């Protein structure tokens, strides 16, 4: 493939390469280390996640009639070594708050016994790693890298779990809690891919954080940083002679849209489409002759999103990130001049740059799109030659380690019709069924994209 594509590489973001938005991720492995303070004889400390789920903060977004205030909904995982003083096993207590109307206060969901082979009087004040594996509500708890889980707990407030039901909890906001006169250290908080690759998605508290409950206790909740959808760009100079034709050949791990000198190359949606990517990957061909400028600097850019490659693509949790977890672009541009000479530009990580702060915070077929319009101004004209990209970083070659997809696949020209908009429908009626909730009747069923215009909104309005 590299020979046929002039040594083009699969490229993507070099840092924060796995797209991540905490309120939208229901499949994850979460690990942290906690050390209880020996001097103060601390017996308990808790880690918090799944906090401030937006669905549970607006009764219009859940079926449970819940409208929580900030920091009043979360999952709390408490390490409790007090039973060791009574020659009993230490506990991992799982609390839930704000996931049901009856949970205005913390509700104990499960007390998990920890074998003395893992935590005992001899090591009770040593650092202990807690691992939480969540599969669409089904949650597995591990201590200190023990492969066998201590318990499986369904934390979905509906009592149901799996892909046929709305999934709770998500990663959400995370934090820590200690009781009065208790002290603890938390560190190495990491969110990883749930699947076999276990690749790091984001780290939350890499350095030790010392907490002191003082007289009243202490609880703090924080929002982890998101990893936005990848954006890529490069520039190149063309010869000062007439261009006969210019073609782009492109495909992606995920879906992509291409831009040349500020113009979108195609109005097609969801390229390259779905195939069994570990067997067959298709590419598209675009005529970009009208977009290329002769004898001057040109720019070429791409936006990527999950598509069918990664994220949720079926109703089965184990299929999350089925083919891989990082989006990448493979492309080449061939410019043919009227004198018969050719110029080729390919996806070379040393010559392309990537951007970590796209307005597209998250883009997924199953989870939807999160767009922050406040970030749009920073990338205005991002695909034009004179755009200042000094704050962009070097792109990276993307290799999907830990997945079945490798280089043993066929790269074939796409023979299918592109997915295009064929009509624009205007709503025939609109009804405000509840304050702030509107239902639009378009007169027919359809597969399409909504186009809404907003006026008078202040920055930060959701």
Question: Model segments located where?
Answer:
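Extracellular glycan-recognition regions
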Residues: 1-224
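Extended extracellular/luminal ectodomain segments enriched in beta-structured repeat modules
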Residues: 25-29, 239-247, 435, 445-450, ...
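Short beta-strands within extracellular/lumenal beta-sheet-rich domains
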Residues: 15-16, 226-239, 282-287, 433-444
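Accessory beta-strand-rich segments of carbohydrate-active enzymes
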Residues: 135-138, 147-163, 180-182, 232-378, ...
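An acidic-aromatic loop/edge-strand motif
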Residues: 1-2, 46-47, 54, 168-169, ...
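Extracellular/lumenal ectodomain signal focusing on beta-strand-rich modules
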Residues: 7, 27, 173, 187-188, ...
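Surface beta-strand/loop "capping" patches
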Residues: 328, 423-437, 444
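Beta-sandwich interaction modules
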Residues: 18-25, 118-120, 162-164, 281-291, ...
